[in-house]
Amino acid sequence: GANMNKMGYVGEVKSLISELMQYNVRPDALAEFLEKEPLGEGLRLKMQDVLTMYQGFTEYLKGRYITAEEVLELLYDVAEESELLRNSVIVLDEFTGFTPIQNRLMEKLLVLAKKVSVSVTMDVREDFYQCRGVHELFAMSKKAVASLLKVAELCKVPVEEPLVLPTGKQRRYANAADLYFMEQNLFRPGAGSYRYKAPEQSMQHIRITSLKNPREELKFAAREIVRLTRENGYRYRDIAVVTGDVQQYGNYVPEIFEQYHIPYFIDQTKNILFHPFIECIRAILEMIEYDFSYESVFRFLRCGLAARVVTEAKNSDKEPDPAATEDLTQQPETGSHGLTEQEIDRLENYVLARGIRGASRWSRPWTFVMPDGTLEDMARLNEIREAVYENFKPLLEAFRGKDNTVSTQTYELYSLIRRLDMEQLLKERGNFFEAHGNQARAKEYDQIYKIVMDLLDKVTSLLGDETMTIREYSDILDAGFEAAKVGIIPPGNDTVTVGDIERTRLNHVKILFFVGVNDGVVPKAGNQGGIISQFEREKMAEYHLELAPGAREKVFIQKFYLYLNMTKPSERLYVT
């Protein structure tokens, strides 16, 4: 109970329930496990709490919604009805492993399909069917092979002899003996030392550089990319940048790559929590919670989407202040068709000077004329005051009424968003970014309104009849905003891909920049967080309850991903 209000706790519970679903551990199976197995008292009580939440969650959703984790289970139920799957040829490429729920679906696919081909990454010198432990470099691949063979045996489906592709020396590494040697020896027991004949040819395809910070690393990469494309004829699509911390390095990529005119695509889903639209909604709720405090009011008015809280200025024929004019090559204009930045400044000065706080002060006319002001200025300030208060009044009343439900509160929030014409403002911003060549930002603005509307719909559907305080309501929306992501598709074919060593899938890469190869980043430091500890996971595994890999196993998994990335480029590897 006390943990419920801790930052990130809801996310941890969500992750654990998602994990249980992915690994096909249903509430009844978990309940049976807790009843039969002699777990320690602490772990038992913890998992009992998890079971209570898990049961409540699944019971509440029954007949209303399905989770993303249940999609494969539904496909399993209807797969036999699909003409597309029957007698088809299915190819599974670049899978590093399969969860229990995926293996369950494979049972149907093996029976229905004419042929199923699965590719795995493994050294031809390895025993494909024997794994001595998670410490082996190709343990994930061997585990995937073992699970597929088990499914095939269960379904009585014959398994063909494995097709082993030729080694890289004759193909990818024909002109890069040093890269081929690294691929054959990296993380292998008894690895040898590279020997070369001519010093000038030594390690010419592998370069290790030390730089002082992420910005300098990316500047180095950008300069090399420009040189390689201009002098050596490489295309941008031949080049990729990977890192163990795409969140940090991704913050510097737009500025640096645009400075060097390099087209790029960052392969990550972006958190929306700090998007201007989300910031605006959070400011709106803060105004209600803190009763029109100075800080909350101007957080809202300066969020960039509050321009239409008031109609266009009557004195719009005045010349704009050149000092306040925005550089339209950088940001879209936000003050058109309504409230301007100059007016917000004047309003803020007046509110500060008069100490105006509280909705009641905003509901009554302001009469004091500032020494440097005019009656016309005062009339405009009152026009803005009235527009702000009248727009917010229905939402204010929705949260002040004791019997008002979440459905009523959400409807009034939605109505305010509509009155402020935010959907149109977001479209205008998206069009601006598209016109200025920033496709990623344009796509972000295209998606954000629908994401928020879907969240409000879900809140209404799930909690519509509940009553709650403004703080509880804000926390629920924040949890939804924190979980929501914006996905961006590549803007074109000829771009440099910037990605994560685990998530990003690279094909036909000739040159790879591996940046941020530092302790704690590659491999990542073990995450000690989570509801279930590493020890508890191992304890549960002893009793045959399979969950996602723990911190110890993840270290070896990262080593495998490190191998995959460092052996991707066929011609040059840069490590910084």
Which role does the model predict for each range below?
Residues 1-576:
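Polyanion-engaging groove/track-forming segments
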